[in-house]
């Protein structure tokens, strides 16, 4: 593994589509969200003072162990450039900067009402398959589900707070915010921006045929279609399945679309 970068950001915002595109480059390895962020957090916790043997660890050892986690996980990967995907990485920017000084983070974002809409659409599409997103619960309404995912520890609320932390934090110069709306409407523009951001030669991608299928994982999670990417990259306007009052609750949350709220050094494309 010669280069490591990260894909993070909001759910239902194009991270799997972006990974599917990056995979077209034979030099790159990318995929859906993986286990490394969870393993990383578990290791950090176990090396803390709550473990009585932590007295044998200093920060230099901790850093070597954490780097070793990535080296071990990707030891069988022949790609020259690896992109590890997880929504948790935005909250780990200080650690990433210290462990991997050359690593960049791509944060995929989307207007919040459409993130909530996308999740609800999946639920309604799979009415006979309760989703792991809601602990396989069969009850609730569109309102309770939206409140659940938008909560501070929810599937959307947690990553949203982490995104804001990354965008306004000291490491924002190594962060590229990629808007789903631009990715689907102008994929060439997005990919060129990414190649420039990570300092790699541009590759000509096939935007007319993008495939990435992890059906087994999605079905096990009770949410078929959660990560499936097929066909051409294109914007597909549609009506929302959210009630108007619920949709309007989130319309002003896309801070990255307001120039006066974008701090110096943060790139948004």
Question: Model-found features: residue ranges?
Answer:
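Conserved phosphate-donor/acceptor-positioning beta-strand/loop module used by diverse small-molecule
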Residues: 85-88, 96-122
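PAPS-dependent sulfotransferase catalytic domain
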Residues: 60-76, 117-197
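PAPS-dependent sulfotransferases, especially Golgi type II membrane carbohydrate sulfotransferases
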Residues: 1-5, 149-169, 173, 188-189, ...
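PAPS-dependent sulfotransferase catalytic core
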Residues: 1-69, 76, 124, 213-221, ...
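Glycine-rich phosphate-binding loop used to anchor ATP phosphates in small-molecule kinases
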Residues: 69-95
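PAPS/PAP-binding and catalytic site of the sulfotransferase fold
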Residues: 14-28, 96-100, 120, 177-202
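Short beta-strand segments
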Residues: 7-9, 82-85, 107-109, 177-179
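Short aromatic-enriched loop/helix-cap "lid" or pocket-rim segments at secondary-structure transitions
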Residues: 41-46, 96, 117-121, 128, ...
């Amino acid at each position: 593994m010669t280069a490591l970068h990260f894909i993070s950001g909001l759910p239902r915002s194009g991270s799997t589509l972006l990974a599917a595109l990056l995979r077209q480059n034979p030099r790159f390895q990318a995929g859906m969200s993986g286990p490394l962020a969870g393993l990383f957090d578990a290791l950090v916790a176990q090396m803390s003072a709550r473990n009585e043997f932590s007295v044998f660890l200093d920060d230099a050892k901790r850093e070597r162990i954490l780097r070793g986690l990535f080296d071990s996980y990707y030891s069988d990967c022949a790609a020259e450039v690896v992109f590890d995907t997880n929504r948790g990485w935005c909250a780990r920017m200080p650690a990433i900067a210290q462990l991997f000084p050359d690593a960049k983070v791509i944060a995929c974002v989307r207007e919040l009402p459409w993130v909530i809409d996308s999740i609800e659409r999946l639920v309604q599409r799979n009415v006979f398959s309760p989703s792991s997103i809601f602990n396989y619960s069969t009850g609730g309404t569109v309102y309770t589900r939206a409140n659940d995912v938008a909560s501070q520890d929810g599937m959307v609320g947690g990553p949203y707070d982490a995104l804001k932390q990354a965008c306004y934090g000291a490491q924002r110069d190594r962060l590229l915010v990629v808007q789903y709306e631009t990715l689907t409407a102008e994929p060439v523009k997005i990919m060129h921006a990414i190649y420039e951001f990570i300092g790699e030669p541009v590759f000509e991608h096939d935007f007319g045929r993008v495939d990435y299928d992890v059906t087994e994982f999605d079905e096990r999670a009770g949410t078929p279609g959660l990560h499936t990417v097929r066909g051409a990259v294109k914007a597909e306007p549609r009506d929302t399945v959210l009630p108007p009052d619920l949709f309007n609750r989130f319309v002003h949350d896309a801070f990255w679309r307001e120039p006066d709220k974008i701090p110096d050094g943060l790139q948004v494309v």
